[in-house]
Amino acid sequence: MKMMNGEDATDQMIKESFFITHGNPILTVEDTHPLRPFFETWREKIFSKKPKAILIISGHWETVKPTVNAVHINDTIHDFDDYPAAMYLFKYPAPGAPELARKVEEILKKSGFETAETDEKRGLDHGAWVPLMLMYPEADIPVCQLSVQPHLDGTYHYNLGRALAPLKNDGVLIIGSGSATHPLDETPHYFDGVAPWAAAFDSWLRKALINGRFEEVNIYETKAPNWKLAHPFPEHFYPLHVVLGAAGEKWKAELIHSSWDHGTLCHGSYKFTSA
C-alpha cells in the first residue's frame, strides 16, 4: 500500500474510526430490522467520505494469532445455519486489499505482534459483509478483514489497534464489527423493554466511552456490571477494543445508534473522532 504525501495525504486522512453492532444476519431480508436504516443511511448521516480502503475487525473470525486476509476478490462467507434460503444467495464481491494486508502484517510485526500473518484464501464473514452490503452496496471499496484472539484480553486488542492507527492517515477506514452486548442464545428474552442487567451494562459502557475512560473498557471484567451476561465470550467485544486503540491518544466518542433485539442484544454503535 503506497504512502501518500502533501495534499493527497491531507485529503485522504481519516480521523474517525467506528464500532458497529452488526446484528442478526436476518436483517438482510427483514426490512423492519432496526439496524437497516442505520446502515442504509451510513453515507448520508454518519460518514460521507469515501475511504481508500476498509479494514474491518469482525467478531466472527477467531484465530490464535492476528491474521489479516490478503485476497484480490473477497468471497462471501455464509457462516450461519437455518436461515431463509434467499440469504445464502447474497454476494458481496468487494475487491480485496492485499497490499493493505501486507502493510497490516508489517506494522503489527514491528509493533511486537511477531506472530501476525496473512491468509490468502479467506473471504468476508457475515460480521463484515452484512453491514458493508448495506453501507457500501456498490462493493467498490477494497476491504480486508482482521481476526480477533478471544483467548487474550482487552488491553492486548487495544494495543493492536494502537499499532494500526497510522493507517487512517492513508485513507483507511477502520471498523470494528461486533456487538455492544452478546448474550448466550439461551439467555431469556425480555419482553418488557430492556432487561435490567443489559441496561446496566449498556449504561456503563456508554458513560465510559463518552467520558474517555478507555482503561475501564480494557479491563471491563473488573469494572462492568453484569459483564458475564453481556459478554460470556469476548469475541464480539474485542473489535471495540481494537477501534479504541486505533482512535489514538486523544479522541471523542459519540453514540451513533442504539436499539435492541429481544431486550438483551444491544445494537449500540459508536464513532471515535481523533483530535
UniProtKB/Swiss-Prot annotation:
The UniProt entry, under InterPro entries, shows:
Extradiol_dOase_DODA (IPR014436), Xdiol_dOase_suB (IPR004183)
Induction trigger:
Regulated by MYB1.
The record ties this protein, via SUPFAM superfamilies, to: LigB-like
Positions bound to Zn(2+)? H22, H60, H182, H236
Known EC number: 1.13.11.29
GO MF annotation terms? ferrous iron binding; stizolobate synthase activity; zinc ion binding
| CDD domains linked to this entry | 45_DOPA_Dioxygenase
Q: How is the cofactor bound?
A: Binds 1 zinc ion per subunit.
The catalytic activity, as recorded, is:
L-dopa + O2 = 4-(L-alanin-3-yl)-2-hydroxy-cis,cis-muconate 6-semialdehyde + H(+)
Q: Pfam families in the record, alphabetically?
A: LigB
* Record carries keyword Oxidoreductase: yes
Pathway(s) where this gene product acts:
Pigment biosynthesis; betalain biosynthesis
> Which of UniProt's keywords are assigned here?
Dioxygenase, Metal-binding, Oxidoreductase, Zinc
Q: Which cofactor does it need?
A: Zn(2+)
Q: What class of enzyme is it?
A: oxidoreductase
Function statement: Opens the cyclic ring of dihydroxy-phenylalanine (DOPA) between carbons 4 and 5, thus producing an unstable seco-DOPA that rearranges nonenzymatically to betalamic acid.
Q: Which family does it belong to?
A: Belongs to the DODA-type extradiol aromatic ring-opening dioxygenase family.
* PANTHER family for this protein: 4,5-DOPA DIOXYGENASE EXTRADIOL-LIKE PROTEIN (PTHR30096:SF0)
Name assigned to this protein: 4,5-DOPA dioxygenase extradiol 1
Per UniProt, what is the name of the gene that codes for the protein in this document?
Answer: DODA1
